[in-house]
Amino acid sequence: MMINNLEALKLFAHHKGGGSTANGRNSAGRRLGAKRADGQKINAGSIIFRQRGTKIHPGKNVGIGGDDTLFALTSGVVKFERLGRDRKQVSVYPVEEAK
């Protein structure tokens, strides 16, 4: 019986199929952190800091969302401050506009 070249390649192939790995995936970053800098002007409702947990606490005129995001309750200037020895807070102080 005669075997043609194509069948010979099929018969004598020696590489096995590729297996799967347990690793090899990653999740995208969550874009957490400061969205406004100290001394920057901000409008009411703007996000100041995105975080998980209360790394930075809300100060004057700053609200906290359900996912611990800090946002401005009034328009003004952002100020990052120390709250005791080991805590930080962010406040928004209103600015009187020049007329």
Curated annotation (Swiss-Prot):
A single BP term in Gene Ontology: translation
InterPro entries attached to this UniProt entry: Ribosomal_bL27, Ribosomal_bL27_CS
Cited PANTHER family: LARGE RIBOSOMAL SUBUNIT PROTEIN BL27M, RIBOSOMAL PROTEIN L27
Annotated family: Belongs to the bacterial ribosomal protein bL27 family.
GO cellular component, one term: cytosolic large ribosomal subunit
Propeptide: 1-12
PTM notes: The N-terminus is cleaved by ribosomal processing cysteine protease Prp.
Keywords: Ribonucleoprotein, Ribosomal protein
Source organism, top-level taxon: Bacteria
Region (Disordered): 15-36
Listed name of the protein: Large ribosomal subunit protein bL27
An example Gene Ontology molecular-function term: structural constituent of ribosome
Cross-referenced Pfam families: Ribosomal_L27
Disulfide bonds: none
